Design a protein with these regions (language model features):
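Anion-recognition interface
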Residues: 1-205
């Protein structure tokens, strides 16, 4: 990590930290006073998005329906498949709570971050103890993909847009509705447990 100057907050972003079992202990050893920001989204949508990313690189030619179950007949969800395993947020959070209190964590709804980024960023700024400077004027909707873009101020040229890369917002494949229902049933108890752990309802159930 880069050094933080006085009066400066440094953010390090590595998505895999949240789901890697040994990381909470190592992070705690680095600093037990830091704050943690976790962006979560509907685990069913997240799994499909993860699959879409892999499929776009042609790393596996099998369909989502073939990958998500242990076999084609049992309808038992394959919890060892990474796109499924990552979405069991309660399991991952349990490891972090062994080292950090909930007060040092802030959970951002991935859905609300897209729908209303200014409100979500206000909560983040408040959590970090910052004077709010990012507001609705810093965002606009990129209609083609439905993702908000950021207007970054430039002293010489004025505000200029910064949008997410082309890898974001890929069109998801059509998934058998019965598979979606099976996944929602699978995640439901884990989602409810996660809601209780963080005292927040994300609306996935």
């Amino acid at each position: 990590m880069p050094r933080s100057e006085e009066g400066q907050l440094t953010i390090e972003k590595t998505p895999s930290y949240f789901i890697t079992k040994d990381v909470p202990r190592r992070v705690y050893q680095f600093s037990k006073h830091l704050k943690l920001i976790v962006v979560v989204r509907d685990p069913v949508t997240r799994a499909i998005s993860d699959y879409t990313q892999v499929a776009s690189k042609k790393m596996d030619s099998r369909s989502f329906e073939e990958m998500v179950f242990v076999d084609n007949t049992s309808r038992i969800v394959d919890t060892q498949w990474s796109p499924v395993r990552i979405g069991v947020y309660a399991k991952h959070l349990k490891h972090w709570l062994q080292y950090f209190p909930l007060e040092q964590m802030h959970f951002v709804s991935g859905e609300r971050l897209i729908e209303n980024p200014a409100d979500e960023m206000l909560k983040v700024q408040q959590f970090l103890g910052l004077r709010p400077v990012i507001n609705h004027r810093h965002f606009y909707l990129k209609s083609r993909k439905g993702f908000p873009c950021i207007l970054k101020p430039n002293r010489q040229k004025g505000s200029h847009p910064h949008c997410l890369g082309e890898t974001k917002g890929r069109i998801h494949p059509m998934i058998d509705p019965s598979v979606i229902r099976r996944l929602r049933d699978f995640y439901k108890p884990f989602n409810i447990k996660f809601y209780r752990m963080v005292n927040q309802d994300f609306g996935w159930v």
